[in-house]
């Protein structure tokens, strides 16, 4: 065990901007000064002279061994986000304003945890503690990231691959295209509903158990889809399948944060975040070739095989990474090995029940949507964009099959424009990071604290993307003539993909930093709005394109996006004042 540095500081010794980061560590059992015992990792035969050398005044002969451990380094942070994610569900409650310092991954954020003087509070034995997920090899951590990203990709691909089956489902079940589209809408609605329950459950039982259970049911509910005797069975199974698969869209971001320190987090989080947006574009591409050569059932057989492989990988290679649950396991082992029942982990001192946590995780997102104009407008903006993306699954076949004579597999290939655009948008991340760095530097030059930031500094990509999107939609709409080469609307769809990624990258980080105490709820509100808009838009998309024409239907969508474009600029300029008058946002 590596002893803590003598220069380790308490929360009283650091600037206010550092205190949030320290409170994060306390919430997941990471000591910021020599106050906690190093669990029982010291060798039993360690000499008393060594103990006295650590702190002679506190370790006389016969007393407990010294408590001298310091785990993850304190990182200056403007916002509190333990582990680097905003996916925890332990938001503060009314009447407990002082209990919560951030939305961190720690169990105990927003709940009572043992005070710093507690003698038997279990914490990590330094950075190299073998139980600490951040001590795993880089290869293993990246393999876990890739498995989580592939699982998320599988779920979102399942949402859109289904759209390739419409042509065969309608005559077989004697139903309309609108009813078939309900299968897409209900699945996406399930993706927005599931996190309300699965996210808080992961705070109590760990991420691994939620992954295994949810993905098992995701695989199980795929079977009724593949053998559905009627459309009602298909629709019910699709909704439940979406609920089950939503865990990797809501919980897996926390897994990435568990394994990587903040200075390492950017690239793995980018890889994971990209997968839910890339998946929908792959679905029609794969599904088009499947149904062109065989029946619609094989779309689900392929997904069952893929999901089965992912489930095996999850069971074999994805361990528990949630720090509070791991510390609880460590405390249980210590009590068993030492016979001392005083050893305790922070999560074991929670004063909130599972049902109460789930209830708050369902209520808080709607409070933010109803009472926070910044959260509401940014959620509407991102929801409209995802709704348009899913509407394209109905619009693309109309445009490219009717105007250009594409087959169903060729129509799937048309989605490569969106795919390339999104990948391009992801690759521009270093540009926005440099802009963010310049804004931070300007703030320092104007008298701000070194390293300090403002949530609004995350919005430049959203500002640009919010204007790129309507331009791309107008361009796409007015090039959907048979006389215009098919590559032109595909190019504009790629530009739409770039703008969509730029909008989301800024919105997500802004919400987490602007609402540090309620980051999980802010993200849940965004996810809920996005999912239900994405579920609703396809239901009227085809009718709108048929009644208004391809050009004017897309123009309506462009004006809808254009109406939301000024809001990121307003929030960039006046966000600090709005946050100052907010009951939920950071000042």
Region locations from a protein language model:
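A six-helix transmembrane bundle that forms the core substrate pathway of small-molecule transporters
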Residues: 118-587
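Intrinsically disordered, low-complexity terminal tails of fungal membrane proteins
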Residues: 1-140, 318-360, 433-455, 577-587
